[in-house]
Amino acid sequence: MKRLILITLLATISLATAGAVEPKTFCRFVPERSDDFAWENDKIAFRAYGPALSASAENSGIDCWLKRVDCPIINKWYKENAEGKSYHKDHGEGYDPYKVGASRGCGGVALWLDGKMVISNVFREWKVVKSSKEESAFVLTYYWKHDRDSYKEDKKISIKLGDRLFKTESTFWKNDNIAIGLPIAVGVLRHKKSNKLSKNLDKGWVSVWEKLDGSELGTGVLMDPSRIEKHELYVTGKKLEDHTLLITKTDKNGQVQFYAGYGWKKAGGINTAAEWEVYLNGFRHQTDSN
């Protein structure tokens, strides 16, 4: 009898192990949900808005999906949402409470012209470059016009396993030519005036720490400090329009590079604003050494 119980127990463990989903990075276009493009690793998840939402309030901002499991959730959440189980409610794995609207969200960009953000609409084109356990990468292409000038952005995003930040390498064109020295704003949204704003320009980052549904969330962007022109607290007083921004310029190749991401208290690992700032400081050192 004991032997039978042992065999049954071992078989159960074996099946559970075989069915376990390993942590990995992942990205894909999601035509079944208004042309989203979503990406994730074992700690963080995001989405950008695509062509089907070109007439909506959303544009080129980045939305945070707050996850608290290390297995992939993108396909599961979209499938369950289509079946009536909303990803805007936490069912044990996390959820999407982060409001973006027409803002930059977490790591969106804008042209910085005459002291104002000039933003693009949703992406029009997409291409997966890489999708593996350790790293996923893709390109989103944006087009827009301003004052008779036409602009294009090829936004290459990559995400590595274990990181709380994803990397963006954006290349800009103006009137079909590589845009050198183009002023660009990169930042994160401040949802409320009570949110804690922090910055360390010597380390190259700005962040927001906020209370959210009984927990807390830190968001931030980070870039090479030598590429920062200035910090800008962009305040209009209107809903979803206040941002903390890093102002930079495109380099000789028309490019801007930076990192963006979050730490969610409910997921563990980052529990305070101070811990989030320590992480951002440490991440800068990692990128300096690469």
What are these regions (language model features)?
Residues 9-18:
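Hydrophobic h-region of N-terminal signal peptides that target proteins for export
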Residues 173, 190-249:
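Accessory, usually C-terminal, subdomains that scaffold auxiliary metal cofactors
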Residues 139-143, 156-158, 169-171, 187, ...:
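Residue-level recognition of well-ordered beta-strand positions that form the cores
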Residues 21-117:
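Solvent-exposed N-terminal domain segments of exported/luminal and surface proteins
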Residues 153, 164-199:
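Acidic (Asp/Glu-rich), glycine- and aromatic
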Residues 86-160:
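Extended, loop-rich substrate-binding clefts of extracytoplasmic carbohydrate-active enzymes
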Residues 1-4:
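Positively charged n-region of N-terminal signal peptides that target proteins for export
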Residues 19, 224-290:
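Beta-strand-rich recognition/accessory modules
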